[in-house]
């Protein structure tokens, strides 16, 4: 009865009790549960939607709700992910068996990345893969995607695959000209099928630009992931109230560190410098390591337009040769950037570190600094690795040597604590002044980069520990333990492909199965294969089997770093979580009890959004790199369509074989091309980690992808002459 139903969870239970007995329409359910009144009606509909989104009930084509029984229905439900080749996949675990359902682009039926979908027409293979098609979209992730306007009210999808189009309100079309790229929110319900095209209603959120605009491709990627260069007018208005230099009244209550030898170390082109460092060695051999971070929270009042926009963006996005900042440049490159030769407001973490690398004590306080020099990684590496001293660095060499000493000690300490070092397979694009890709280089972490990373980790750890024991609201950076099954699956792949020795893998698998392993074991395993030619593949497979780090309002430790306490404190110019950490540092001095209680309530949602926007920025950065690779290989193809490239297979699935060329470009071989290789007797050569030789088959700029054909003639040779 309705009087017994007190909240939405009770309503859900009552719905499940009813559909357990028989299938019911929404009206029959409403009647059976005595749903009356607007409030009860709204809660009832919300409960129905939540149950359907979680895959607990199923709404059939006749309008009946029933319990979602995968075996009985012959359907499964899950979150769809769509790769750049147009194929979708859904991971579902049922009765202890995890299956990857593969959906051809012809059977996506309008599904977009991250949507919750129901799959039908399932055909299981011999492995844990199955083919399926999307029956319906239960919930849109956000429904936003890019279309290109072709006139007369018609749109074509620009970046998504499949036969999909949208119909937008006429009043929204008035602002458009043919060739406009627009960000459209697509409804989940298909309204028609016309000439094999799924038609959806849509609403234009933003005109991104015109297809002929410079940098339109990068603007398109950014818009897809929620990043825009323009700031709202109210943000621009607030900027006018923020000073461009430190004022005398700003110094009140701050420790004056302007007489210390403090400096920054960043990339050569970095303009938003939010961290500076200094160090002293004590007479008894200890170190006082100081990390000074731009005090952005001093200038950005909570809930002001600048703060609201930063919260919305979550992070800065670095897209090839351009940056979409979290704050306007007047903030990120100006008053909050720790530029050389000017006073800046900071939050400082002083750490007393033992000769063995243990942080014995720390202090966190507001300060003012005056950076002595803007250093860059290349110059500092010249000093520390080659003993070459660039002009202007002479007076800083003794300090840099002490810092190097401290960094090496911290590296060893982190190793003992279980920090897992993965091989970086990151690639950076080197561009011309106009943004044209010139080459692709692997990112390397040298002495200077490692030094800054170690110092920032030390500061982040100290701040996290401080707040954990203070027991006040805070944002933490957490990384959970790996899923044992996923890790074992990755190890079995390495064994099957004969990339690693069977004995070494079996030892680790047995430890995992017996529950007797930790991050030290994983670290030892990776170190063991560090000189293996396929170490990047080994490292990548292990890394992708692990969960991603995220933000959370509770301190749960960081598995990958082997740390009990961790947060992000050191980049408040470009990361919203760091700004929140700054705000919540020393909260008992600044906030009353009601405010603290409010943070306890709001932090979970803030952490979830910040984690989401971090993933969006990462994906936008990856897609931008893919775009530059596609543009580069398009030029290569136009110059010489018969050029042969050497590379290595880095990933294989039934729907895709991924190859990384020696020039660091990543491309793909389709299943049909692999089938052809098998037919002519070359299948035994095609394994994970194998060297292969390819020609460019096709390049798609909208989908940011390069397709290869295997060069069978070269595959059969023992010695290959590869064109440079």
List each language-model region with its residue ranges.
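Charge-lined substrate channels and their catalytic hotspots, especially those that engage the 3′ end
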Residues: 2-290, 297-343, 374, 381-382, ...
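Electropositive polyanion-binding surfaces
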Residues: 31-34, 189-193, 214, 220, ...
């Amino acid at each position: 009865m309705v009087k017994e139903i007190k909240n939405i969870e009770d309503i859900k239970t009552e719905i499940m009790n009813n559909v357990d007995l028989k299938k019911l329409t929404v009206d029959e359910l409403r009647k059976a549960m005595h749903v009356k009144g607007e409030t009860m009606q709204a809660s009832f509909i919300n409960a129905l939607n939540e149950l359907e989104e979680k895959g607990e009930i199923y709404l059939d084509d006749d309008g009946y709700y029933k319990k979602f029984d995968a075996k009985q229905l012959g359907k499964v439900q899950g979150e769809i992910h769509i790769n750049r080749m147009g194929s979708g996949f859904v991971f579902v675990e049922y009765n202890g068996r995890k299956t990857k359902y593969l959906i051809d682009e012809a059977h996506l039926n309008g599904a977009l990345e991250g949507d919750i979908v129901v799959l039908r027409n399932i055909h299981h293979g011999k492995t844990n893969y199955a083919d399926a098609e999307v029956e319906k979209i239960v919930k849109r992730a956000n429904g936003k995607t890019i279309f290109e306007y072709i006139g007369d009210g018609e749109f074509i999808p620009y970046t998504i695959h499949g036969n999909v189009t949208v119909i937008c309100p006429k009043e929204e079309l008035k602002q458009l000209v043919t060739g406009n790229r627009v960000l459209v929110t697509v409804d989940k319900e298909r309204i028609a099928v016309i000439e094999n095209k799924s038609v959806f209603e849509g609403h234009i959120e933003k005109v991104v630009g015109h297809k002929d605009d410079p940098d339109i491709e990068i603007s398109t990627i950014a818009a897809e992931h929620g990043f825009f260069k323009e700031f709202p007018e109210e943000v621009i208005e607030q900027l006018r109230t923020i000073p461009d230099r430190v004022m005398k009244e700003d110094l009140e209550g701050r420790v004056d560190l302007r007489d210390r030898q403090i400096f920054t170390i960043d990339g050569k082109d970095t303009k938003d410098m939010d961290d500076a460092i200094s160090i002293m060695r004590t007479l008894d051999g200890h170190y006082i390591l100081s990390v000074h971070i731009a005090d952005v929270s001093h200038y950005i009042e909570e809930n002001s337009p600048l703060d609201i926009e930063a919260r919305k963006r979550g992070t800065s996005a670095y897209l090839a040769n351009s940056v979409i900042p979290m704050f306007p440049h007047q903030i990120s490159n100006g008053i909050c950037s720790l530029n050389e030769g000017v006073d800046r407001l900071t939050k400082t973490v002083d750490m007393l570190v033992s000769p063995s690398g243990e942080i014995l004590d720390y202090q966190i306080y507001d300060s003012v600094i005056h950076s002595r020099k803007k250093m860059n990684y290349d110059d500092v590496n010249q000093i520390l690795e080659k003993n070459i001293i660039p002009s202007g660095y002479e007076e800083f060499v003794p300090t840099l040597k002490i810092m190097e000493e401290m960094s090496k000690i911290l590296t060893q300490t982190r190793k003992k604590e279980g920090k897992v070092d993965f091989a970086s397979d990151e690639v950076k694009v080197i561009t011309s002044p106009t943004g044209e890709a010139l080459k692709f280089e692997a990112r390397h972490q040298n002495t200077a980069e490692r030094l800054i990373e170690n110092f920032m980790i030390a500061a982040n750890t100290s701040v996290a520990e401080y707040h954990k024991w203070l027991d006040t609201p805070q944002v933490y950076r957490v990384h959970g333990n790996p899923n044992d099954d996923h890790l074992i699956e990755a190890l079995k792949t390495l064994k099957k492909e004969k990339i690693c020795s069977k004995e070494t893998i079996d030892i680790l698998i047995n430890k995992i199965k017996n529950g007797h392993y930790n991050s030290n074991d994983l670290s030892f395993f990776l170190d063991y294969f560090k000189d293996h030619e396929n170490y990047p593949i080994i490292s990548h497979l292990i890394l992708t089997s692990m969960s991603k780090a995220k933000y959370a309002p509770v301190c749960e430790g960081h598995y990958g770093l082997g740390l009990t306490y961790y947060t992000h404190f050191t980049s408040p110019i470009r990361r919203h979580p760091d700004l929140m950490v700054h705000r919540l540092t020393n909260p008992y001095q600044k906030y009353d009890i009601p405010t603290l209680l409010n943070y306890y309530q709001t932090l979970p949602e803030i952490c979830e959004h910040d984690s989401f926007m971090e993933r969006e920025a990462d994906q936008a950065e990856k897609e931008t790199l893919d775009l530059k690779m596609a543009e580069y290989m398009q030029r290569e193809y136009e110059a010489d369509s018969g050029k042969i490239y050497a590379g290595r297979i880095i990933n294989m699935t039934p729907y895709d074989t991924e190859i990384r060329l020696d020039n660091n470009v990543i491309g793909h071989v389709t299943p049909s091309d692999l089938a052809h290789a098998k037919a002519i007797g070359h299948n035994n050569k095609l394994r994970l980690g194998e060297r292969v030789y390819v020609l460019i088959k096709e390049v798609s700029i909208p989908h940011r992808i390069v397709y290869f054909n295997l060069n069978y003639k070269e595959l059969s040779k023992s010695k290959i002459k590869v064109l440079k």
